[in-house]
Amino acid sequence: MAVRNIIFSVIIPTHKRSVLLSRALQSVKSQSQERDLEVIVVSDVIDSSTDAVCNFYLGIDDIYIRRNGVAGPSDSRNLGKSLASGHYILFLDDDDAWHPDFLKNLYEGIRLHPNHSLYFDCSVVKETRGSSEPRFISESVLNLVNILTMDVYVKNQVHMSCFAFPKALVNNLSFDRSMRAYEDWDFQLSVYDQEFPIYIPLLGSRIFEVDDSSSDRRGSSQAATDLNAVFDYLYVYRRHPGPDDRIREMRQQLLTSVGFRIDKDLL
C-alpha cells in the first residue's frame, strides 16, 4: 500500500457542539484537494453526538480523540499538533468552516512560498443560534492584504483560522493553557518572533459570529471582556516584549486608556 503524502493537517478542537462541528467537517471533507489532508478532531468531553458526527465524516487516515483533563481549546490544539503528520498545520474552530476550493488554492500558495507561514482572506458570517440549527443573517468578505503589520504586537489582527504554518516552524510552540483568552494571539506572536507570514490572495475560512444572547463563543464571555482581559494582555506583553519604542508606546497608550499606567520601558 502506498504511503500517503500528507500536505496539510487541520486541527479542530471541539466541545459538545455536534451541529456546528458537522458544518465544519462537511466543509473540510468536501475540499477538492482533500486527499492531501489529515483531519484531527480533539474533543475535551465525552459526547455521543460528537462521536456520531466524527464517525460519519472522518476517514481511516483521520484522527478523532476524546481527551481527559481540563476543558479548553489550548490542550486540545497542543495534543492535535503533536499528532499531526502534515507538512503544514492549520487550525479551525468547530463553529467555523472553509470555503470551497480553499485547499486547492492554498496548495498553489505553498508552491510559490514553500516552507513559509502564510495568511489569507476570510469571510465573516453573522448568525443566531437560538434554535437547534444556526440561522444565517449576513456574510461579508474580509480582504486581509496589508492587514498584518508590526502593530500586531499591540493587538491581534488576524483570526487563527487564516494561517497555514509549516510544521517545522511550530513543532516546539504550544498554546498556553493558563490563559483565559488570547492564547491564539500569544501563539501567533511566537511565530512572528521567528518569521512574519506572507499574505496570499485567496479566500480561506468562514468565521461565524453571534452577536446576540445565543452566543457561546468563549471570546464573548465575561472572562474575556472584563479586567481579566487586561491581565492577559499584560501577560502577552511580558512574554513578547515590544520590538521597538513605537510599539512600546502604543502598548502604553492602550493600557492607559483602560486605567493602567505602566512605564513603556516595561512593555
How would you describe each model-predicted region?
Residues 68-84:
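Glycine-rich, basic loop-to-helix element that forms the pyrophosphate-binding segment
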Residues 25-67:
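Acidic donor-binding segment of Leloir-type glycosyltransferases
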Residues 25-26, 86, 99-111:
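Short alpha-helix within the catalytic core of nucleotide-sugar-dependent glycosyltransferases
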Residues 143-227:
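Conserved nucleotide-sugar donor-binding catalytic segment
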Residues 1-27:
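N-proximal low-complexity "stem/linker" segments adjacent to membrane-targeting elements
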Residues 75, 104-169, 217-220, 237-249:
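Flexible acidic/His/Gly-enriched loops in nucleotide-sugar-dependent glycosyltransferase catalytic domains
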Residues 89:
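Short aromatic/hydrophobic "clamp" motif used to bind/position activated sugar donors
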Residues 93-97:
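The conserved acidic donor/metal-binding loop of glycosyltransferases
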